[in-house]
Amino acid sequence: MKEKIININSDLIKELRKRTSIGVVECKQALIKANGDLELAIDNMRRSGLKTACKKSGHITSSGLIAVEITSNKQYGIMIEINCETDFVAKDSTFQEFAKTVIITALNEKIHDINILQTRFKEQRTNLIAQVGENINIRRFVVLTGDFLGCYVHGFKIGVIVAASGNVTADLMKHISMHIAAKNPKYINVNDVPRNVIIRENNIQMDIAMKSGKSYKISEKITAGRMSKFFNDIVLTKQNFIMDINKTVEELLIEYHIKINNFARFELGEDM
């Protein structure tokens, strides 16, 4: 007897992927086995080894780890955030080995696209979900290049990677990375702060001062002082260096003839 050929609509595959987070090939096979019945395909998946992945795919993943890897020549580096649901799994060696494999692969293959990286590890992620019983998410990563890269990771919760040029040493780059981890600047220099951000903050501080009953001239002076503090909070070079609070980061960079060209800072679960 001739075997019946079943044509599966691509929209049906997309819907099954959306509802299960399973790969295209597996979804197509499941739909063929279920004669195109979406709900039956899901039921069959849940009965199979993909059951846990289907069940867990919508869970929030706010735990996990931050990892950083830099090439031996210190000129190319990657920082990544991979999430799970609990600290228990985050500390599990299997989860940590998965994270290590992901970042090393991204580094060696010079992957720049998060979608490519997620697809590359789709099967391994699904298997890990089934093994540890929690959803796993390769959430984000950043690539930095430069004359000299440094990094720092604090307890797998905060990660920093910095690109610099000049008379750079590994120890100094680590200390600058530690400073960024602790102080969380948003920009390198005052000139990097968008004009609309400065105008908005200045207007807010001026309004606050004027509403307190101060004259316009005094309000301007108060606003100038508050804007100075504002820049100290968000601009790296204006901050006091945590290793020597008697000097600013800007003074440190001048002293050692160093220029910070770029940096990135990840904090686990931020903006989720």
UniProtKB/Swiss-Prot annotation:
**Annotated localization:** Cytoplasm
Q: Which GO terms describe its molecular function?
A: translation elongation factor activity
The family database entries (CDD domains) matched by this protein are listed as: UBA_EF-Ts
Superkingdom as given in the UniProt entry: Bacteria
Q: Which Pfam families match?
A: EF_TS (PF00889)
The answer, when asked if Transit peptide is one of the entry's keywords, is no
Q: Read off the InterPro entries from this record.
A: EF-Ts_dimer_sf, Transl_elong_EFTs/EF1B, Transl_elong_EFTs/EF1B_dimer, Transl_elong_Ts_CS, UBA-like_sf
> Where are the stretches annotated Involved in Mg(2+) ion dislocation from EF-Tu?
86-89
Q: Can you quote a single GO CC term? A: cytoplasm
Give the record's keywords alphabetically.
Answer: Cytoplasm, Elongation factor, Protein biosynthesis
Statement: the UniProt record of this protein carries the keyword Cytoplasm: yes
- What family is reported? Belongs to the EF-Ts family.
PANTHER family associated with the record: ELONGATION FACTOR TS, ELONGATION FACTOR TS, MITOCHONDRIAL
NCBIfam families reported for this sequence: tsf (TIGR00116)
What does this chain do?
A: Associates with the EF-Tu.GDP complex and induces the exchange of GDP to GTP. It remains bound to the aminoacyl-tRNA.EF-Tu.GTP complex up to the GTP hydrolysis stage on the ribosome.
For this entry, the protein name equals Elongation factor Ts
Please name the source species.
Blochmanniella pennsylvanica (strain BPEN)
